Swiss-Prot record:
CDD domains: Trp-synth_B
Name the UniProt record assigns to this protein: Tryptophan synthase beta chain
Positions of the UniProt region annotated as Disordered: 1-23
Known role: The beta subunit is responsible for the synthesis of L-tryptophan from indole and L-serine.
EC number: 4.2.1.20
Organism, scientific name: Parasynechococcus marenigrum (strain WH8102)
Pathway named in the protein's UniProt entry: Amino-acid biosynthesis; L-tryptophan biosynthesis; L-tryptophan from chorismate: step 5/5
One MF annotation (Gene Ontology) recorded for this entry: tryptophan synthase activity
Compositional bias segments (type: Polar residues): 1-18
Subunit details: Tetramer of two alpha and two beta chains.
Chemical reaction(s) catalysed: (1S,2R)-1-C-(indol-3-yl)glycerol 3-phosphate + L-serine = D-glyceraldehyde 3-phosphate + L-tryptophan + H2O
Location of N6-(pyridoxal phosphate)lysine modifications: 111
Amino acid sequence: MTSTLPNASTPDPASLQPSVRPGAHGRFGRFGGQYVPETLMPALAELEQAAAQAWNDPAFTAELNQLLKNYVGRATPLYEAERLTAHYRRADGGPRIWLKREDLNHTGAHKINNALGQALLALRMGKKRIIAETGAGQHGVATATVCARFGLECVIYMGAEDMRRQALNVFRMRLLGATVQPVTAGTATLKDATSEAIRDWVTNVESTHYILGSVAGPHPYPMLVRDFHAVIGQEARQQCREAFGRLPDVLMACVGGGSNAMGLFHPFVECTNVRLIGVEAAGDGVATGRHAATITEGRAGVLHGAMSLLLQDSDGQVQEAHSISAGLDYPGVGPEHSYLREIGRAEYGAVTDQQALGALRLVSELEGIIPALETAHAFAWLEQLCPTLPDGSEVVINCSGRGDKDVNTVAEKLGDQL
């Protein structure tokens, strides 16, 4: 494997109480904050206030829960991957593998949990125009979907390279009535799309709400996006108790910006006997410099309004990221992930493009589930994790999205092998 995981130390429980994460000024330890133009500060304050009021409004939570159930299709199942479990079984036993099936949500990924919640907040704030960034296209599709549902104008910023890789999702967004704005600056991927979305927001802040798609960006976004995705972990806690009578030993998820992982991890952070493992994209290999292993290789810096770990050169300039997965092709990561790594509560590793492709094929053939390339990175870590776990261990992987969108990319890479 590309990297090894450090031993997780037990953090001070007092530092992990939900009420203090984030703390003052949107900080997770030294990470987070609000590094934005002054013109955006009123909008961020308005959003934070609207979210606080909404969570305390029974009508809001009732509407959100009703839509999550009847529109999104929650709760998503916790599925026992019997053949994948058997594949990794040793002579002396091994772990049992479970999948939290976020791929079964409406639109095919976890992204709609957050898009739906933020759309409801936009309506409360009287905003009629929505913008968003997208990499793999799943957040763009989810945002376009909820905008269609509520009759909101929708503009999606997407890197031109990602539009090429994810042409199917581009068509889906346009079919849903969204304008997809190509971004050709820089590497024409997620970082550049995010930068363009922020520029739009600065210009149109009075009429526009920015539905940021990950647990990144300025406060309150890392907290807001996490809280809308926490339904993943909340359901998983209950489902684990029903399935095997206790909490799992390991939770695992892929990490780009980190929203699906944080949604799964958050309700378990205080349960220090549950290991939290995030898996990043090592691209062509960390040693090559062509990767997106931000936590594994990054240093603290500021990008898109927050301090977090970033891929940087010796001059402190943000480096280009690379991954076969458009959703992981980002040189930063959510500040709470950086914090959980720094205090030793969560562990992070990285797998290469080839390892992810191998895992995608393995899961497809063994379970009849074609995972997204992003999700396949988490599956690939099983190769390193399973030999280290005692018999009877329970492992839950967040199956964050389905792989329909990636079939063309996978066909280019594996077509002659099938």
